[in-house]
Amino acid sequence: MALKEYKPMTPGLRGRIDLRKDEITAQKPEKSLTTGKKNRAGRDSRGRISVRGQGGGHKQKYRQIDFKRNKYGIPGTVRTIEYDPNRSANIALIFYADGEKRYIIAPKGLKIGQKIMSGEMATLDVANALPLEAIPVGFTVHNIELTIGRGGQMARSAGAGALVAAKEGEYVTIRLPSGETRLVNKKCYATIGEVGNEDHMNTSLGKAGRSRWLGIRPTVRGMAMNPIDHPLGGGEGRGKGRHPVTPWGQPCKGYKTRKKRNPSDSFIVSRRKKKN
């Protein structure tokens, strides 16, 4: 999907870079696969802020996505490719032979009218879902399960794709987009190909108002607050006065927060690599 730039006729257009909507074929979602979505504005069940910097934004409907891909042996046809405000990737509406409709994440190269399939006997074509044991080494996959039957949890964002690196015993070695190498049970399902809309990372909102449309509120530095609001607040000038910390006093900027005895450590061959 190509990028679209604008003439600098206003300050907001000067830095704006959008995606061209050439792939999008439908403007309204399938009504039977959408539900209402309440804007939590970063609040928890007590009404207190649990995630800062969220709130407002345009009203959205949630599209129910089929992450499990458990229509085994039933062929489906790609009917539309649509925009989804809840994720960076586009989604595709699938009409199955038994009459059911489902949304899936749209992989790169998916075409209208294309036939897709899930199951052990599915071919190794883009958008087909198979168990990892049936996918050859060297293939790129997305929407990867961590637990058998739970549905895809890894490599689901725009442009994401993981590499099937090796197979040994009950596990398959997967190299994730983050650079982490991980063992996954060979019975877990994954979808062939990488997620589409790969140019999403190259877009630019261009103005603060577009962030507000997306429900993103301004991020305030701790140093700019009062002492009552943040450990780095107050004082004369711009000095921090201590090592940078979160509003709750936990060190940040390099401080490791992962549990020392995380059960998943035994499945991680090598940790993710830092990106320059």
Swiss-Prot record:
Residues 1-61, 224-276 are annotated as: Disordered. Keywords: Ribonucleoprotein, Ribosomal protein, RNA-binding, rRNA-binding. The keyword Ligase does not apply. GO terms for cellular component: large ribosomal subunit. One of its GO terms (molecular function) is rRNA binding. GO terms for biological process: cytoplasmic translation. PANTHER family: LARGE RIBOSOMAL SUBUNIT PROTEIN UL2M, RIBOSOMAL PROTEIN L2. Part of the 50S ribosomal subunit. Forms a bridge to the 30S subunit in the 70S ribosome. One of the primary rRNA binding proteins. Required for association of the 30S and 50S subunits to form the 70S ribosome, for tRNA binding and peptide bond formation. It has been suggested to have peptidyltransferase activity; this is somewhat controversial. Makes several contacts with the 16S rRNA in the 70S ribosome. This is Large ribosomal subunit protein uL2. It comes from Treponema denticola (strain ATCC 35405 / DSM 14222 / CIP 103919 / JCM 8153 / KCTC 15104).
